[in-house]
Amino acid sequence: MPTRRPHLFALLGAIVVLIPGAAIGSSVDVQVTSAIPMTEPQNDALQQSPSLSASVAALKSGLDALAANDIQRARQVREALPAKSLDRHILAWAIALYGGDQVPSGDIADAAKMLPNWPGTIALRKNSERALYRENPTPQIVVRAFDGSQPLTFEGVVILARSYVALGDTKAARSVLSPFWRTEKLEAGDEAAVIREFGALIPAADHRFRMERMFYADRVASALRVAGLAGAQQLADAWAAVSKGDKNAAKLLKAVPAAQRAAGYLFAEAEYLRKQQKFSDAAALVMKAPGDRDALVDADAWWVERRVLSRELVDQGDMKTAYRIVAAHAAESPANAAEAEFHAGWYALRGLNDPSTATKHFARIAELAQAPMSLSRAYYWLGRAAEVGGPGNAKDYFSRAASYGTTFYGQLAGERVGRQTLNIVYPSPSAGDRRNFATREAVSAIKRLQEAGYDRYAETLYRDLAGQLTSPGELALLAVLAERQGNHFMALKVGKIAGARGIDVGALSHPLGVIPDTANISGSGKALAYAIARQESEFNIGAVSSAGARGLLQLMPGTAKQLAKKAGMTFSQARLTTDAGYNATLGAAFLGEQLGRFDGSYVLTFAGYNAGPTRAAQWVAKYGDPRGKDVDAVVDWIERIPYTETRSYVQRVMENYEVYKMRISDKYDIVGDLVNGRG
């Protein structure tokens, strides 16, 4: 029966060749490829394509056909290309990655075998499963194709479970269905199809797990769809009423039978009480929750409820109960666990004046985290705890935090120990870096795809290399390759992806160049524009949000029109997404206005930019005015912002601003900027 393969299998997407089909250059029976090791490509086996200055007409014609959904033509072009040539590799990979109704599973499987080190193996695996579902071979072939591995798609689950049922192995069918059904978010039609075909086969306990999981994910309709099969209709009706804010929620909660009152019931009742602003009563229920993650069904959802409730209690002045709630968390993901430990440590230190207890929580963040953002926060707050009697040496902790100079807390720590500069040197590639980079097949493919005008496929390769390369020098070469194409968005992504892996990429994570000299912006204004643009659009000049915000600094057309009029400029909506200098000029003017609105406060301006100026003003009324306060009070004010997204946004833009000030003017002053704002 299917089993969970090691994590390596999932990550590298060991491709299962699903059925015989129109394979690349051959006819094959069912094949299985094992876990794919991420080794260096063997370039001696590759027949070099013509130089990049030569025509790429054949490759482009194949990619054009693919873009037009003419799969037959794309496959014909692929077959006409020289065997083992780079162009054939590129087109075979692109066809397999594209998938679609006309791409046989054999094509996908052969591409995976031919290109084991290329990106997108999980996507290829998923496309293979969908192709198998369409081709609908015999149950024996399906079972052999999956070779004991768990499907990754809805189609794969259905075809494999169906095959096991046809072969009389219902136990194996359940082993396929259960892990998928318990957690996967599905469209209503797919959900109904599973219930119709397999509803009676799936155990009631799995239906119950799914019901609760969907409620935790705020997918109420999905949860209600399986409530009957779960044998928990009364709980589902009550929980749905709580989620929707129905007036009869309390009555329905009371009517839930004792047999259905497990952890999910506690969650629904606690959520109801919180929404009724009965925070102490809600806290008492939350503290009754089991510590076992399996019993909680979704431990991370429980953490979110604890966080929201704890902040309400802090606002009520009950720091002690707030601490107890977050300290007893069972958050599962490392990111949520680190966030929970921060809340516990921060409440203990700043609310309860207990540096020893706070230190234990902050130290736990350092154990959980790998990313510079989290590590710098851990060491900074360990230093703060040590300053007021906690264990350890405050200066040592601050020095460790300061080594992460591109982060908010790293910069604060740097000023705490008297550092005048940030360590953001641009990586310098060695001769070895250049040799290694030049021999990578994926790099050659990027250049070829760019020459053919297909940057979207090239970007997949950029991202994959940014997630694999370990040398800052090679990563710098990759970013420069993108910049030379004018793709500042991808140059930034390279730095961000590598930086998130814990690689010291220096200035690579904060590149310059997207704002041209034609932009009418001062030096400090340019640093501010870069800081906002990095967060808002990630330097995607053509970005358009769902709300209609456009371009580098995500300006609304109406706002941009008013700004252009004030500046005596001709307004052009089209230029907002095509002319970075135009967008940046108007955006800098808008930022200047917002800074004026908040008396020069960067903190309030950034909070208002993200959540709206009205909310920023409301938070001033609720939490006090950070303007003119000492730096520790300003940091506390930022951490009190009730919106997680806005808290993070203020810190991210602030750290960006300091990095770009350093890069443009060779100085930074995060303490002065937090306390005094714009001078």
Tell me the role of every PLM-derived stretch.
Residues 61, 92-95, 128, 160, ...:
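Structural register within alpha-helical repeat arrays
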Residues 44-52, 75-86, 97-100, 109-120, ...:
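Solenoid-like repeat scaffolds
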Residues 58, 88, 92, 108, ...:
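TPR repeat positional signature
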